[in-house]
Amino acid sequence: MRKIGKSHKLDNVCYDIRGPVLAEAMRMERQGYDIIKLNIGNPAPFGFNAPDEVREDLIANLAKAQGYSESKGVFAARKAIMHETQRLGIKGVTVDDIILGNGVSELIVMAMQALLDSGDEVLIPMPDYPLWTAAVNLAGGRAVHYLCDEE
């Protein structure tokens, strides 16, 4: 049987959400250290809960939440975003211009795949969220990091 190896597209991808940093944190936990993992953007375990109103609306609408939404996302949510762009004075944004996803990670990857050609350079602040660099590399672009210096 032929061994299936990883794609060379992953050669320049380092994504510590699931990589060596997480492995070290897990090793330290096994040794008894109390580790707060902020690497996956899940604030709930640290006491940052959704507002009661949001949770109540989710519960009230759960029975109707069967199946898929529209491919661009829930219309009411897209419309609310459009109204917010208008409130902010951003002109020309229609509800059809707005695409929702399952989270920022999915949307960053989709945007990079859609916008980058091989070799395109993307400026990324450093330190960065590893997904930004990974998404650029996977899309064939080249991440160009610049240092964020508060001075």
Summary of predicted features, one role per range:
Residues 1-8, 116-122:
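Long, low-complexity, intrinsically disordered polar/charged segments
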Residues 2-5, 11-103, 110:
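N-terminal small-domain helix-loop-helix segment of the aminotransferase-like
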Residues 107-108, 132:
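Short, hydrophobic alpha-helical packing/hinge segments within bilobed ligand-binding/sensory domains
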Residues 113-151:
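PLP-dependent aminotransferase-like
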